[in-house]
Curated annotation (Swiss-Prot):
Keywords tagged on the record: Ribonucleoprotein, Ribosomal protein, RNA-binding, rRNA-binding
Keyword Iron on entry: no
PANTHER family: LARGE RIBOSOMAL SUBUNIT PROTEIN UL2M, RIBOSOMAL PROTEIN L2
Residue numbers spanned by region Disordered: 210-278
Lineage summary: Bacteria, Bacillati, Bacillota, Bacilli, Lactobacillales
Subunit structure: Part of the 50S ribosomal subunit. Forms a bridge to the 30S subunit in the 70S ribosome.
Record protein name field: Large ribosomal subunit protein uL2
Pfam families: Ribosomal_L2 (PF00181), Ribosomal_L2_C (PF03947)
HAMAP family: Ribosomal_uL2_B
A molecular-function term among this protein's GO annotations: rRNA binding
Length: 278
């Protein structure tokens, strides 16, 4: 994947970059693996805003992704690498030898025509899915399960990667993208390799309209609101926050407060917390 930088022919084009989509080999998705989805614009069933700054955006079809990878000992051929508007990573279309078609997250360097498979006896190569107990230490992995059979939940964004550090009884030590080291059941599955489209984070949208295409609405600063709308609001001119430290719109401290529940049951599985946490 290469980054295209546009000439500043207009203010919106200045500093705008995009992907060249050189890895994409198929434009139209597989119809049997599509589902319609409705956008709620951040509202719940009562019509109340539960997530701010969402709404609009281009209409999208949801691609059904196989995060479980539980078709053991059945080989599949990569037929295409496709764009998925619902995620940052690209997806790969697989044709299994028994006639089943499926989408998976496209790992880095996965090519059309590559044969992939799942199961404890699969080879250690990008795109293959194995239980953590069958993956040697030092191997890069992604799409990691937290509960056996539930499907991958960790390391699914573009360019992310985790690493197997070793086995410890019924658990496997894994270092995540954030630097966190945690225990995961060795019967959980993961896919070999790192997630592709690794230069996604380098893309600059360049203009507000491109953000609106993604379904993201503008965000106003609290300091320009009225005092009944935000703790930072009110005052004459450019007034300071007026509090000991910045606050969220709901009056809670927004800096330096831990958001993780220290009494969570999974806390005992974390060997080392992510970078920045002590």
């Amino acid at each position: 994947m290469a980054i295209i930088k546009y000439k500043p022919t207009t203010n919106g084009r200045r500093n705008m970059t995009s992907s060249d989509f050189a890895e994409i080999t198929k434009k139209k998705p597989e119809k049997t693996l599509l589902e319609s989805q409705s956008h709620t614009a951040g509202r719940n069933s009562y019509g109340h805003i539960t997530v701010r700054h969402r709404g609009g955006g281009h209409k999208q079809k949801y691609r059904i992704i196989d995060f479980k990878r539980n078709k053991d000992d059945v080989k599949a051929v990569v037929k295409a690498i496709e764009y998925d508007p619902n995620r940052t990573a690209n997806i790969a279309l697989l044709h299994y030898t028994d006639g089943i078609k499926a989408y998976i997250l496209a790992p880095k360097d996965l090519k059309v025509g590559t044969v992939v498979e799942s199961g404890p006896n699969a080879d250690i190569k990008p795109g293959n899915a194995l239980p953590l107990s069958a993956i040697p230490a030092g191997t890069e992995i992604h799409n990691i399960e937290l509960k056996p059979g539930k499907g991958g939940q960790l390391v699914r964004s573009a360019g992310t990667v985790a690493q197997v550090l070793g086995n410890d009884g019924k658990y496997t030590l894994v270092r995540l993208q954030s630097g966190e080291v945690r225990k995961i059941l060795s019967t959980c599955r993961a896919t070999i390799g790192s997630v592709g489209n690794e230069q996604h984070s380098l893309i600059q949208l360049g203009k507000a309209g491109r953000k609106r295409w993604l379904g993201k609405r503008p965000q106003s600063r609290g300091s320009v609101m009225n005092p009944n709308d935000h703790p930072h609001g009110g005052g004459e001119g450019k007034a300071p926050v007026g509090r000991p430290q910045p606050m969220t719109p709901w009056g809670k401290k927004s800096r330096g407060i831990k958001t993780r529940n220290s009494k969570a049951r999974s806390e005992k599985l974390i060997i080392r917390h992510r970078k920045g946490n002590k």
